[in-house]
Design a protein with these regions (language model features):
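Glycine-rich, aromatic-lined ligand/substrate-binding cores of catalytic
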Residues: 747-779
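C-terminal beta-barrel architecture of Gram-negative outer-membrane proteins
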Residues: 732-733, 766-827, 862
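Conserved small-residue
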Residues: 156-191, 417-419, 618, 635-746, ...
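Short aromatic-centered micro-motifs
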Residues: 97, 393, 462, 704, ...
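Short, small/polar-rich motifs associated with maturation and membrane association
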Residues: 1-256, 260-269, 315, 329-331, ...
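Extracellular/periplasmic, surface-exposed regions of secreted and cell-surface proteins
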Residues: 206-209, 244, 250-256, 264-270, ...
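Acidic, glycine-rich flexible loop segments
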Residues: 280-315
């Protein structure tokens, strides 16, 4: 049975902790002594042109924050975010998201219309992340949405319309070059009589439109704001579209002489996405299909296939595969704040969230022999409630702020899915699974899980002379997901700040406007690697056997019980400061941090018996991250007619896997020091003794390239070219295994990242240019490895230049390992604020933008902006799955009434 924290257990624990120290209210984070990267989004959204995802606004505007599209599919709205790198192997690395006080996630944030967001605040430091206890180790993104202003009735409307054009595509042999190469090599190539570029066949000019309407009204005592947003995107890949509709209402009411403030909000969104079912098959087929084959069906209604090619299908036929997603999200929340005394506030907050996600897939019989259909539905409900008591008072040279808070979070998830094959007709798609011939064993399932988290929080902040500040925080979390022996965990932090500018010895330095120093140390946790039933013995069906002539399902253990399982703990130290000169027209910030993750989760091989299963998830490993973040901004020109502003953030980050060995209940446990985590495989990978490329190695950054070293090419007896591999161990034999003749030759994660913005205003005209960059990392060009392989020709088409190279070797080596450094011009926007003289129209703005303007890089592939941050099998590997790079041209209009 699922173990819950009962309300009386929660209250008793809260009372016990409260006797020792005051607690802290989550809603009062802003009272802490912390330095946060705050990104106001209004101008960012307006200047960036087409913005389909709220996280696009954050990308490049906060030091140490990296936003990456999931996988290789840039049509998807969902992104992955890393704050100061990776802190766990199997635990969650996406930051916690708090939207107007409501606990959320990256997926939900991606559905919010960007213009609804007033600002992001990224919490990274020790004192900041410790506030969120067992969920703060990967950083926290606080999102503040817009509210009514109480300035009377107002209406605003914004729209952007854009076209997307492919900016770069693979240069494969044309039909004429394909036939000429086959003739020159003396090999037979089937001539279908057509001349096709299949990338052109499956792509189109994309079209995207965004519309946003908001109105607000009321007075300072009672106000409201409502907004509606719609995004419609016809992507550059034919038949693949998505749209998103969002609605949001907020009401604020003051009562009893402003002693009581109530805030009520409702948010809802619906999202539909016609995604690509098999990204690799689609784009690999488009590149490598015989260019003389027809783009559509032949005269008999059949598709022309090459039966000798592995995972190659006519690209237009692959487009008929469907992978559709429908998601609905609803949230309502209420906050009440009552002023008990001039220095004492009592607040209560509650929220309810509901998510429904439907996934449907269909593969027709002309792609898969028996066809394939899938339907699944996933639902989630969340309840959140907290009560806090906050005190703030100043007397003389002293100031004190303190708070108490308790919180309870409950989550429930259900799911059902089924998969079938043996399609009678393709006409039904995925809408009539009953018409299929079979449902494979294990392809139908359902789940139910729930989890709860109880929290107690404390905060005290003391300020002397309004320039020396000391802050102490403590959070205790009790989770139903961890082991019985570790139900509660405690996460303290301490931080200090010195406002040097207010010192007497700087009173004569008028050029210095701001000078602050700060430091902090704290603990935070990570529950991401633990699900609802991870600590228990789990079983699942293993087969069907006859019992008394009745088919009976057999069950087997799939997980060991671990009552000692707990959250990972990250300890962070940071020190930094900021200086502002000449009325802060020149600002410089710098911060160094070091964090160490201990009790890191990892799955270990264990003996059976005494264990019931051969794997055990345990808290044993350790990992470190350290870095330096620098921020710079300058406003060199500020006049009535001209404003020029330049800002930049630069982050240096170093990760290290410290250990995977340790002790569990008196038993020494360890994992392999070298483990492959990413490979070149799938379509087009013909030959090669060991295709592993990316590894986790103890003592190295997580995700390094561990490859044989190629010293050049040599011509074999047949006159073809192969890679000459260095014999590192000098044993006379080239070993492509995971040791011997391999060496560490770079990392997939950038050592440094850059974000920069230049904005210029001349009278009513303005211009904004955003640049992002990443440096110090490598990319394995698996696409070039596969598409330059002449041993697969003419079954597969190849890139131009491949026949001249005549390489027939498919073994991986550092020959195709390239520098991944790049500087990307993210967007350029030029606009005009139209002068208006009207009692109705308050402002009118028109603009034109180009997104993904240009990229400066030495990388030879389509784009260096692949997954370089999320540790998975695709990290740092360009492996034929790349979504086409495209450029967006858009115009925008914003009007306020």
């Amino acid at each position: 049975m699922m173990r819950h924290l009962k309300p009386y257990q929660y209250l008793l624990a809260a009372t016990a902790v409260s006797l020792l120290m005051p607690t802290f209210a989550t809603a009062q984070v802003q009272e802490l002594n912390v330095q946060r990267d705050t990104v106001p989004t209004y101008l960012k959204v307006q200047n960036k042109g087409i913005v389909n995802n709220a996280l696009d606004v954050l990308n490049g505007n906060a030091a140490g924050v990296n936003v990456t599209s999931n996988g290789m599919d840039r049509m998807a709205q969902l992104s992955s975010v890393r704050v100061r790198g990776t802190t766990s192997i199997v635990g969650g690395n996406d930051p916690l998201v708090i939207i107007d006080g409501v606990t959320s996630d990256i997926a939900t944030l991606s559905t919010i219309y960007p213009a609804d967001i007033e600002s992001f605040a990224v919490l990274k430091n020790a004192a900041e992340t410790a506030l969120y206890g067992s969920r703060g180790a990967s950083g926290v993104i606080e999102v503040k949405t817009k509210r009514g202003t109480g300035k009377g009735f107002q209406i605003s409307y914004e729209t952007n319309i854009g076209l997307e054009a492919m900016s770069k595509k693979l240069d494969m042999l044309s039909a004429d070059e394909y036939l000429a190469t086959a003739k020159r090599l003396g090999v037979y190539a089937n001539n279908g009589g057509y001349k096709n570029n299949f990338y052109d066949v499956i792509t189109r000019t994309g079209f995207v439109q965004n519309h946003y309407l908001a109105f607000s009204g009321g007075s300072e005592q009672s106000n409201y704001r409502a907004s509606f947003g719609y995004i419609d995107h016809n992507t550059i890949v034919k038949t693949k579209d998505y749209n998103n509709f969002v609605a949001k209402i907020d009401v604020t009411q003051h009562a009893f002489g402003n002693r009581l403030v109530g805030d009520f909000g409702v948010f809802g969104s619906t999202y539909k996405n016609n995604d690509i079912f098999d990204t690799q098959m689609l784009f690999y087929s488009a590149a490598c299909q015989n260019p003389t084959y027809p783009a559509g069906r032949d005269a008999n209604g059949n598709w022309t296939k090459n039966g000798s090619a592995y995972r190659i299908n006519p690209p237009s036929a692959v487009l008929a595969e469907r992978s559709d997603q429908k998601e609905m999200y609803f949230n309502t929340h209420m906050r009440l704040l009552y002023k008990l005394a001039p220095s004492l506030n009592l607040s209560a907050f509650g929220s309810y969230s509901y998510t429904s996600n439907e996934n449907s897939e269909f593969c027709p019989t002309w792609v898969w022999a028996q066809g394939n259909v899938y339907r699944g539905e996933f639902k989630k409900q969340e309840y959140l409630g907290n009560v806090s008591l906050d005190y703030a008072h100043t007397w003389g040279i002293h100031s004190l702020a303190a708070g108490l808070s308790t919180e309870y979070h409950y989550q429930e998830r259900t799911a059902f899915w089924t998969r079938a094959k043996g399609i009678t007709t393709n006409e039904f798609g995925y809408d009539n699974i009953g018409a299929t011939a079979s449902r494979p064993y294990g392809a139908t399932g359902s789940i139910y899980e729930d989890q709860s988290l109880a929290s107690v929080m404390a905060n005290a902040s003391y300020t002397l002379y309004n320039k020396y500040k000391l802050t102490l925080t403590m959070r205790g979390d009790g989770s139903s997901m961890v082991g019985d022996n570790n139900t509660w965990g405690f996460f303290p932090s301490v931080s200090a700040e010195w406002d040097v500018k207010k010192e007497h010895f700087l009173s004569g330095f008028d050029g210095i406007s701001t000078l602050k120093l700060r430091t902090g140390y704290g603990h935070s946790g990570n529950l991401g690697g633990i699900s609802a039933y991870t600590t228990m013995n789990n079983v699942q069906q293993t087969g069907i056997v006859p019992v008394n002539n009745t088919p009976t399902v057999t069950l087997g253990t799939i997980r060991n019980n671990n009552p000692d399982l707990k959250w990972e703990t990250k300890s962070t130290f940071n020190i930094g400061g900021e200086i502002g000169l000449w009325h802060n027209r020149l600002m410089l910030t710098a911060e160094y941090y070091y964090s160490k993750t201990t009790d890191m989760l990892y799955s270990y091989d264990v003996p059976v018996p005494p264990f019931a299963y051969d794997k055990l998830l345990a808290n044993i490993g350790a990992m470190s991250n350290q870095g330096l973040e620098i921020g710079f901004s300058i406003a060199p020109v500020q006049t009535k007619d001209i404003d020029l502003n330049v800002s930049m953030n630069l982050s240096f980050q170093k990760n290290k896997l410290l250990s995977l060995s340790g002790n569990y209940n008196g038993m020494n446990m360890s994992a392999a020091n070298i483990t492959a985590i990413g490979s070149i495989d799938g379509a087009g990978q013909n030959g090669g003794d060991n295709n592993h490329v990316l590894y986790q190695i103890v003592g190295q950054p997580l995700g390094v390239f561990y490859l044989p070293h190629c010293t050049g090419l040599y011509k074999d007896e047949q006159g073809t070219m192969k890679y000459r591999i260095e014999d590192f161990d000098r044993n006379g034999t080239i070993d492509f295994g995971d040791g011997g003749d391999r060496r560490i030759c770079g990392q997939a994660t950038p050592k440094a990242t850059l974000g920069s913005n230049i904005s210029l205003r001349y009278k009513n005209f303005y211009m904004s240019l955003q640049m992002n960059g990443a440096f110090g990392h490598k990319i394995f060009n698996g696409t070039a490895l596969a598409y330059n392989n002449m041993s697969s020709f003419p079954i597969y088409n190849v890139m131009k230049g491949a026949p001249e190279r005549n390489i027939v070797d498919q073994n991986v080596s550092d020959y195709w390992l390239e520098r991944g450094d790049y500087l990307n011009f993210e967007y350029l926007t030029v606009g005009y604020n139209v002068p208006v003289k009207s009692n109705i129209v308050r402002s009118l703005r028109v603009s034109c933008s180009v997104n993904n303007l240009a990229t400066i890089t030495s990388y030879s592939g389509l784009t260096p902006m692949i997954n370089s941050y999320v540790v998975n099998s695709s990290m740092g590997i360009d492996d034929k799955r790349c979504y086409p790079t495209y450029r967006t041209y858009s115009i925008g209009v914003s009007v306020q009434f």
